[in-house]
Amino acid sequence: GDVYKRQSLGIELKGNVAVKLHSGEEGNQNYLKPEFMHDIITRVSGTVVECNTAYNGARNTTEKHEELMNNHGWSKYYKTDIMDSERDIILDIQNGMIIKKNYVGSHLNNYDSMLVISHFKGHPMGGFGGALKQLSIGVASSSGKTYIHTAGKTTDVSKLWENLPEQDKFIEAMADAASSIHNKFKGNIAYINVMKNMSVDCDCCAKAEDPCMKDIGVLASLDPIAIDKACIDLVRNSTDEGRDHLLERIESRHGEHIIESADKLGFGTSIYELINIDKNKEANKFALHHFTVM
């Protein structure tokens, strides 16, 4: 809980703070629960923000999504906001490789800062989900998710699945979208990646595979590219017997291409220093380790 204080990133998130996390699809067993996040969210006095999905489930309309936020306990502890509940706004991506605009919920403009909390794990479409995916697909409205998934072909949710592009274009479109959110909050945005309950499946899956690796730890950074690269390296360097299963998911979907693409866009870097900030490393060997990624 006091990870944010200890992983002092030299930043105090100002004003109205949006905390972007994954509310967890109905039926999913792996998503990070509201109690786990309690200290950090209350410390920044944040509003838990989410956006509607572009596929069927319990989160594709505001009404259903608000009910799920209630059922999963988010609204019991925190202020919550479905950012695309009213309308979309468009952010320009001037140097976008695939898309030149990003459709996000209009409520994004109500916030001065953002704390991005990502549950690091595999993903059936993106290979893995971390900070970059949370910034892109996570913050996009349902039309925006469609636009990214179709690499800019359509914002019509009903036409998403018949317009899927080649995989690398989708991944590059995610990097483009991520850049627009990071740059919007530049200097007032921080990232936490939690390497816990790591399944090959995302928290958006109603039926997800159980975690395949033991928990590794919690990372904090001001750089979304560095923090995702550090997570992938921690998986790759692990001796855990589930490592290959997770890497197969990441590699088969060209997951790491998002790091290369984001690197090219220049809103961060994949070169990092990983600092273990546990005070007593021995005592912590059975618990989550805490790292800062600089």
PLM regions with names:
Residues 2-38, 42, 46-294:
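Extended, low-polarity segments enriched in aliphatic/aromatic residues
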